[in-house]
Amino acid sequence: FILAAIMFLFIYMIVGKDFTPAVINEVQIESPAEKAGLKKNDIILEIDGTKVESVLDVSKLITMSTSEFIDFKVSRYEKDLFLKIKPNIIATEDNLGNKINKRVVGIVIGAFNDKVNHVKLDPLKALYYSVNEVYFVTSSTLSYLGSMIFGDADTSQLGGPIRIAKISGQVAQFGIIPFLSMMAYISISLGLINLFPIPLLDGGHLMFYGFE
């Protein structure tokens, strides 16, 4: 977890973090978003209770959601609206050519007022957002695992060492920053697995110590 936080800290200080508000540029006809009531020019404030601070957050939060319905909080003419959207699940490929089942709601996102707000953070703010990202990934992973146990999550998204190595090699071709980001996410996942109450893992040792 500490290693992941350090990686995010480095990225936010050196490269920066995006804070561009997300506005809906298009709502596709007959899409889940249109049926739920989303409209063009709605500003997305929250998804599943998590604040949307950047256009980049929208796709991430939709992808990480595991419940049947996704909760949207949007601003329309300075009024806050709360909508529940049941996403469609489509078989597709990610940017690296890996087959995935993707959750989509049928919206096209753009920058509010077409202004991009990408800033390099000072050490204190970078630390805050680094810890926040570690917390988000940890809680989302635990939520996903819980949904998988009860049969509500897509198990095709899981991958073993071979798949991780393959994806890591593909990501490395895009540069050091995307590679570091992926390593941070993997570090969090390994940290969680290490805490599971399984013999030979730290979680197993802690369980035995608790029994003693």
Regions found by a protein language model. Give the residues of each.
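Internal alpha-helical transmembrane segments
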Residues: 1-26
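Short helix-capping/hinge motifs at transmembrane helix termini and TM-loop junctions
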Residues: 7, 11-16, 150-151, 173, ...
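Transmembrane alpha-helical segments of integral membrane proteins
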Residues: 200-212
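Functional transmembrane alpha-helices
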Residues: 91-192, 210-212
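Residue-level signature of catalytic and energy-coupling elements of molecular machines
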Residues: 7, 58, 134, 198
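PDZ-domain C-terminal substructure recognizer with occasional recognition of PDZ-binding tails
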Residues: 10, 35, 39, 45-46, ...
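Conserved PDZ fold ligand-binding element
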Residues: 33-55, 134
